[in-house]
Structure formats: C-alpha cells, structure tokens
C-alpha cells in the first residue's frame, strides 16, 4: 500500500528532501521541457536552452548569497570529497602546509585526503563546555604561519555541531559548507573558497558548487587533473566536460524556490524556528538527550539519544509507520538524527515532536 506523500516527512541527512514544488515542477516538465518535446536531461549541454539554464542558475545563486564579482561560481562533479583533493591541489602553490581545523568527522576526512598532497597542520578545535560537546572559539584557533590556507567545516552533520565564527587571518579561509550553505546568511567576501556538495540544500547528488576568489585561480599544481582545476573550470564555464545537466537544472529550480521564499534571510528565520522547536522539546524532556552545547548546536542536523537506547529500533519503526523517515543516527554515534534542511517544513518538525512526546509518554 502506497503512503500518502502529504503525510511523509524525510529527515535524511543526504541525499536529503527537496522542496515539493521543485519536485512537482520537474515532474510536470520531465517529458516535454519548454515545449521542446524532450526532457531537459536529453538536450545538449551546449545548446542555447541549457546554457540559459546554467547562466540563470549561477545568477540566482549569486543573488541569494550576494556573491561579489571577484568570485567565480563553479558547478563541479565528484561531490565534496572531490573538493577535499581539489582544494590543496589548487591552492597550495609552493607551500607545503595548510591549517585544518578539526571539529568532527568531515573535517578529519578532508585532512586525510590533504595528506596525499601536503603536510596538513591540524588544530583540534573540539572542546567540552558544561559537560557538552563544543568547539573552541575561532579566536583561539592556532594557524600555521606558513599555511597556504585555513580549512574548516562549519557544520558537522554527524555530531550536529555548528561553527558560527571565523578566525581573523590574512590566510584564505576555505569552508566545506555542504550541509549549511543557503541555510543562513554569510559574508562570502570573508572566504577564499566555499564549496558544497549539492545533496543537502542545493539539489540532488551528483553536483557540487565551488565559489572561488579570483586571485586564487592559477595556483594549481601541474599534476592536478583538469577536471578539478578551478582555472580550467572557470574558463570553460563549468563545462570542461559534459556536466550533470539534470542535477544542474534541479539545483536551479531550488534556487528559484528559495528566492520565492524570501531568500536566505527569510529561510534562516524559518530554520531557527524549526531548530528551536526541536531543541526546546529535547531540553525539556528527561527522556531524550542532545549532547551538544547550545553555542554550537547545528541548525540543520539534530542528533538525539534516548535514556533507554534499547528502544531505538522501536522508535524508528513507529516513526517510519507515521511517515517520519530516515531518523536513524549515523553509525558512528548511533541514536537518532533529524536533518531539517531548508526543504523541511515547520509542520514536519512539529509532527516529529508530537510523535516524540507520545513515544515518551508510552515508554518512559
């Protein structure tokens, strides 16, 4: 028996839920896009019709993030993991080290990849505050004087940790914003490179965004594959080879949807409201636990455990039956995790809290 999609809320950490209006538009246009009699995924990436999609997508993203003119916007392949390699290979130049701020799993993953190309200087920013997980303030981060750049991940999806400040440094700041881009306002001009896998707040998996300051182009090592070379991608308008056109088109629809919601400033207010509803209930409960200090709690990913972990399987089964999908926590930390990206409506978070309350009453 098929489930009524009106009552389904997808809390997947990624690939994550897409806005329903975007999915509906893609469905309507799937077989006959713009009256061409074909799908958008069947036309040449060099056709005037698709180039218009690409150009509009870039402009909409520039508008949403207020990206300065001296930054290139690149639509890349390989996801954020490809950027783990692309960043050092593009930015090191003659340097032999870069500072990596370690606040969690994804920052550590970037370090492991960087070790193939340099000797990363790792500053562990993990901390404990009032018995909870936290991150040291950026003012306390130690940056190597010879670092080519400073890399960090502002939002760690597994632990549900978010970093809200930046160091004061003359080094280019590189941020893996895969799980936080477009969720809150940022000042792009403070960064050298911002990159993000698409499958959280941008679109479907298969594409990534890199926003690169112009002065950082042209530093690439000779061994860098052309497909990862920021300068090559910029010169070729992100079409050095055939791009993932359908993912690009869908990302463009997401950008238009976000503009229609009032842009990043408006969606940030919604995101803060959603997160507050969930965190407030967890904090008021004696049955559920979140182990992150309020100063560093993620707006996008809310992990929680129960005081009776033996009930995890029952919780997940009953939640699934009610249309509350993909709440299982990452295998590294266990428990549950609610990912509440831009596409998650407030109604979904309220439905989750209602279920959590009922489950607590029945099982406490």
UniProtKB/Swiss-Prot annotation:
PROSITE patterns found in the cross-reference section: AA_TRANSFER_CLASS_5
Amino-acid positions noted as binding L-glutamate in the UniProt annotation, renumbered to this chain: 46
Sites where the protein binds pyridoxal 5'-phosphate: 80-81, 106, 157, 176, 199, 241-242
Gene Ontology annotations for the cellular component aspect, listed alphabetically: cytoplasm
Modified residues (N6-(pyridoxal phosphate)lysine): 200
Record-listed E.C. numbers: 2.6.1.52
KW Amino-acid biosynthesis (keyword) present: yes
Reaction equations catalysed: O-phospho-L-serine + 2-oxoglutarate = 3-phosphooxypyruvate + L-glutamate; 4-(phosphooxy)-L-threonine + 2-oxoglutarate = (R)-3-hydroxy-2-oxo-4-phosphooxybutanoate + L-glutamate
Taxonomic superkingdom: Bacteria
Family: Belongs to the class-V pyridoxal-phosphate-dependent aminotransferase family. SerC subfamily.
Described function: Catalyzes the reversible conversion of 3-phosphohydroxypyruvate to phosphoserine and of 3-hydroxy-2-oxo-4-phosphonooxybutanoate to phosphohydroxythreonine.
Name of the featured protein: Phosphoserine aminotransferase
Organism: Vibrio vulnificus (strain CMCP6)
